[in-house]
Amino acid sequence: MLALNAGSQYPGRGRGRGRGDGGNRVHKHDGINRYHGGFRGGRGGGGGGFRDGDMRECRERESWAVSAAQANARTLARVPVPVETNCFPIDLSEGRFHNYIVSFEFLENATDMAGDMWKISLQNELLRTIRKNRTAEKRTRTSAEVEDLCVCTGQAILAPAKLSVEDGFSIECTRKEKVSRNNTEERHYRVRIRYDGEVSLKLPEHAQWVNKIIAFGLADTYSEHIGSDYVDMKSTVERGGDLVTMDAISLNALRIVKQSGSTTAMMDVLQLDVSTKASTKTKCSDEMRRLRQQNPQGFRRAVNEALVGISVTTVFGEPTFLKVKAIDFNILASSPTMFKTNPEETFVEYFKRKYDAIIDPTLPMLYCIFADRTKMSRRMPYPADSLLLNKLNEAQLSKLPILCSIYPNERMKRIKAALERVLASPLMITVLQQYGVRIQPQFVKVSGRVLPAPTIYVPSGPNMFNRINTAEYTGQAGFALGLKDLQHPSQPCEFKTLLMDEYFMHGNITHWLQKYNVALPSPRKTSFDSAAQRITEGPGTFAMVKLRTKEAGAYNNFKERFARSSIVSQMAVVDLTRNVPQMITQQVAAKIGQLCFVADVDEAGKSFACRPLLIVGAVVGTAMNTMLEKYKSINVRLYTITFVAFLANGKSWKPYCMHHQVKGEEHVLYEDSDAASSHMSSTTLTVRRQNANEVLNNRFPDFLKEVTAHFKLNGKGSKGTMVLYRGAMTDAEVGFTANMDLVMEQVLPNWDTATVVVHPRSHFRMAWDPTTVFPHETASAYAGLSNVPRGFSTTDCRIILADSDPYTPVDSFYLSAANCTLGHAANTYYLVQKRAASISLMDLQKLTYNMCYMYPNKPDALPLPLPIKCAYEYARKYGSLKSVKELPTRMRPTMHYL
C-alpha cells in the first residue's frame, strides 16, 4: 500500500499527473470518427513526444527503409533477415523461493470480500508480526530483512529465505469497514501460516511468480501498477493544452523457442516494453461546475454518470491513481472530516491547513479507492478540487499521435535505458540477489524471412481481371490507382430497393454505381429526417444517408434502426468531392458481397489450390454502454461475439456473418433517492452471468452448420479446406480455442482443417537495421533501426504457455504485414493450434499475408488478415447497438459492418 504522508489522512501528491482514460481514436468508417476503450499510450514511451526535427528524422528513416526494401525486394526474399527484439535473457538457474501457504479463518463479523487485496493486506500484517517478534529493527525501503522482501499473492507468501516462524503460527487481525456515515463494523480474522517447502523457479510454470518478484523490485522506479503497466508518477511532463504525460513500462517473463534451421532451443527471457501515458490537468470540480451550469435540475444524475467509476489522480502530496467509487451529495467539502485527530475540522479547513489549498465548500465529496489493484484500500472521501480527471476530450485526443508515437530506433534506446535504470535501483538489486534471478541487458536477436507481396486482382468484366503488383505500391494511398478500371461482372440483384437521400442523389454516386456495375436497383429519393421516423421498407433494402453531425450517437441510432428492419446501410458525413464518391461506391459494392479487389487463393500454395476454401474469423469484442432508466443509470459491459466467414474459390470470395450479444457486468451509476435507500450514489457490481468466450464456443457449431448449409458444402462427397482464425486479446482466451477443431471435423468430416489463434496485441517488438542486409547503405544518413520490412515473418520466439508441453511440436509465427512510417508497427502473433498434414505452414503464412491486402476499406496491406479485421470491426461497431442482439437472417450474406 502506498504510504501516507506524515500526519495526512490521504495518499500524498506532488506535481505528478494522472493516467489517460479517454478513448482511442480509430479509423473512419462510413465517414464517422469513432472512439472506444481507454487510451493506453501503447505506441509511446520514455517521456513521449518529439521535437519537430526528431519526428521528421524518424519519418524519413522509415520512408527510406520502405524504399530500400522495395528496391531490394528480390534480395530480401532470398536471404535471412536478422532483427532485434525487446526480449532480454533471464537466468533462473539459481532462482528459488520458500513457499508458505496462508489460510484464513473467519471470526466475528468476518466476510469473504471480493478479490485478493484483503488477503494480501492480512498477509503483510502477519509478516510485520513475524519481523517484530524476531528483531526490533525498523524496516527500511531497501532492507535486506527476509520479511521485507516477501511477495504476497493472496494465497501464499513467497520468501527468499526461510522465515523464523513455526508451522501453524497464527495471529488475529481486525479490519474496520465503514458501512455508513456514522457506523463502522469490526471484522475479525485468524491468519495462519504453513511452510510448503523450497521451490526452484522455472518457466513457464512459475511465470506469474517471476513477474511478481520482479514487479516487487519496481517500487522505487515505476511504483504505480495499472493494468499491465507500471507507471513512474514522478516522470510527469506538461505538454500544453491541459495535457501531461508520464513514463510507463510493461514486463513479462517468458520461455520461448528459438529455431535455427532444423534445430530448436528453449530460452528464458524478460520481455520489456515502454509506453507513454497521457492525462489531463482538468479537476473534477471543474467538470462538476460545468455540469451544474449546464443542467441544474439534473446535476446529481449527470455528475454520477460522468464521474462514478472513472480513474482520477490526486492533486496534493505524492501523485496517486484513484478510482471514484461513490459520490455523497449529503456530505460537502464544508462538512466535518470526522478524523480522530480533529473530528470537527472541515475538509476545507483540513486542506487549507495541510496544503494551503482553496477548496470549494459547495461541492459533494467523492469516495475513492486505489486504482492499483495490488494495493488494499478502503473508501476515502476526497474534495472535487483535490482530484484530476484522467479522461481526455476530443481536442486532447487529437494530440496523442504526436505526444505518444515512438519509432523503432527511439523505442529500443528507451527500452534499454529503462532496463538499465531498473537494474540499477537499490531495491531491484536486492530483490534479484535474494531470489537468485539474473537479467542480462542484451537484446535477443531473431531471424526471419520476407514473404513476397501478393498479386491483387480487380474485376474488369465477365471473367476478366486486371492484375496489380502490390510490391510496387508503398505509399499511403496503397494501390487505389489500380482500381480505376473496376467493373463488376453482371449478377442477379439481391436488393429490391435502393433508398438515397438528396445528398447522395446529387453526389455523383449513381454514376459510379453504374460504372462499377454494382448490383443495386435504380435509387429512390427518400428523406431521412431522424432515426426515429417510421421506415416501411424491410429486407432487401439498401439505404444511403448523409448524417448532419459526426456524433457517434446519431450514427448508432440510424444503424440500429436499419438493422432492426434488416436494411443494409451506408452513411457518410464527408463532402462528396474529389475521389470520395468512388471510395463510397466501392464500399457499397463490398457491403453487398461484390469485393472490388481480391487475392487468388490458388496462389497461396498447393495446400489451398483447386478446391473450396472456407475461412472463418471469430472474436469477442467488448464495449461499455450506459443504460438510462427513469430513476436509474447503469453502466453495462456488453460482449459482442462475431463470426465472419468467406467461401473462396480461386478469385471468387463470398461473405457470410453473424453475431450474438452477451450482457456482462453492470454498475449502477445513479439511483434516484426516491428509489434508492441511500443518498450516496455508488457502483454496484452484479455477477457476470455468462462467460463470453464460453458462449462463443457454444455458438460456433450452429454458425458453422448455418454457413455450410448456406454455401451448400455439406454434401456426402464434399471436400475442401477450412481455416479458423480465432482472435485472442489475452493468453486466457487461447485456452478456449482448444476444442473448436473437433466441431470443424464433425461438421465437415472430409475437409482438411487448421486452427489459428491470432494475438494482435502482444508486446513483442522488432526493429530492423537495413545495413545488416544491404551493407552498401552503411553510410546512409538514415542508418539506424527501423520497422521490419512489410511481409516479415519469423517462427523464432514462440511463446510456451504454462499449461503446454514445451517438447510438443507447435507451429507459430509473427507477421508484420503492413508498412509503417508513423510509429512502431504491431507484430501480430499467430499460434497454429492444429493443422492437417496437407496444409503446410509456409502456405498458411502466405494465405494469412495475402489476406492482409484484402480489407475492402483500404486498398493496401493492413496488420490483420481479412477475417480477423472484419470480425473485430463488426464487434466494435455492433457493440454499441444494444437492441440488435442477433443479426437478421437477410443481412448475414453481406459485409454490412464496413
Swiss-Prot record:
| Compositionally biased tracts (Gly residues) | 38-50
Please tell me the species this chain comes from.
Answer: Leishmania braziliensis
Q: Where is this region: Disordered?
A: 1-52
One Gene Ontology term of the biological-process aspect is:
regulatory ncRNA-mediated gene silencing
Q: Which residue ranges does the record assign to the Piwi domain? A: 542-883
Record's compositionally biased regions (Basic and acidic residues): 18-33
Family annotation (InterPro entries):
ArgoL2, PAZ_dom, PAZ_dom_sf, Piwi, RNaseH-like_sf, RNaseH_sf
Has the keyword Transferase been applied to this entry? no
Gene designation: AGO1
Gene3D superfamilies (UniProt xref): paz domain, Ribonuclease H-like superfamily/Ribonuclease H
User: How is loss of this gene reflected in the phenotype of the organism?
Assistant: RNAi-mediated knockdown reduces RNAi activity. Levels of mobile elements TATE, SLACS, TAS-like and repeat element CIR74 siRNAs are reduced.
Write down what this protein is called: Protein argonaute 1
